[in-house]
């Protein structure tokens, strides 16, 4: 936003000024490189998807919101291994309730959620997690993290109960520390150590903790809701690369984002949600943003 409004832009990184530029003489790519300290690719690099067997099939799904109002109205969709399916739309059109139903956080009123042939519509979040379904929630503070716990405790939230991190309910603290520190380095979580409470981190680094925990578990299906919210541009690039790599390794990814650019760049197919329904399926390579804007407003003809 600064780029479009300001005459001059000062870039700071790690507490130091990296450069002062006239916006009329500087590209967004140059500013991004100064922000990160290396070359940044703003376009997502990926090959054509090669979808195979169906992982998730949602049939006639109805979901009510916390007020008892219908938020998801007869949604049908499928996701195959080896593809990224995106959901686009103005926030408040049922995306939140759809994700909550898929992850067991909200009970569906009607319909089926078939995961590898099993209906998980009535499953608890705990059981869904144990089926190798990862979830990056849109609200990291209230849903994605326990801010009263340490960084390492949040990082092992999906794996604390199994080997090699624990055996018969007893932590192997050496292996826990090794695991947490590896994720800290791999995902560039900026903190002196993993023993600090996660609430001491910036919002962007808190998001990195969530992403690190979810993407490090080799999930079969990843449900990513606003996965890059509050993250710096270099780590946005890294998260996009990780989602594409998961696809290329045979995983299935559902990407829900309020950032239209993100959905269009990362997803292989995009469903547009409007008033609780998926009103249009598109190939992001075959539509432009003006067309998407009309679809997001409910204009499909």
Stretches found by the model and what they are:
Residues 1-301:
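Glycine-rich phosphate-binding loops of nucleotide-dependent enzymes
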């Amino acid at each position: 936003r600064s780029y479009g409004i300001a005459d001059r832009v000062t870039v700071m990184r790690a507490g130091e000024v990296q450069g002062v530029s006239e916006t009329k003489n500087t590209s967004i790519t140059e500013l991004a490189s100064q922000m990160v300290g290396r070359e940044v690719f703003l376009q997502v690099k990926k090959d054509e998807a090669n979808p195979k067997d169906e992982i998730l099939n949602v049939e006639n799904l109805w979901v009510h919101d916390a007020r008892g109002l219908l938020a998801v109205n007869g949604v049908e969709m499928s996701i195959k291994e080896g593809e990224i399916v995106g959901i686009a739309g103005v926030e408040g059109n049922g995306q939140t309730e759809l994700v909550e139903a898929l992850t067991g956080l909200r009970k569906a009123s009607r319909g089926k959620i078939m995961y590898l042939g099993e209906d998980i519509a009535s499953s608890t979040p705990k059981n869904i997690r144990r089926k190798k379904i990862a979830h990056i929630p849109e609200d990291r503070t209230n849903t994605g993290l326990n801010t009263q716990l340490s960084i390492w405790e949040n990082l092992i939230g999906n794996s604390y109960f199994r080997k090699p991190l624990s055996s018969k309910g007893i932590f192997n603290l050496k292996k826990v520390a090794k695991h947490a520190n590896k994720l800290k380095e791999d995902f560039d979580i900026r903190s002196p150590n993993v023993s600090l409470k996660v609430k001491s981190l910036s919002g962007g680094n808190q998001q990195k903790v969530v992403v690190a925990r979810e993407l490090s578990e080799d999930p079969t299906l990843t449900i990513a809701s606003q996965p890059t919210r509050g993250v710096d541009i270099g780590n946005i690039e890294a998260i996009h690369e990780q989602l594409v790599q998961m696809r290329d390794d045979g995983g299935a990814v559902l990407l829900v984002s309020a950032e239209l650019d993100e959905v269009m760049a990362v997803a292989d197919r995009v469903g547009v949600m409007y008033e609780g329904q998926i009103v249009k399926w598109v190939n992001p390579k075959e539509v432009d943003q003006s067309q998407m804007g009309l679809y997001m407003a409910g204009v499909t003809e």
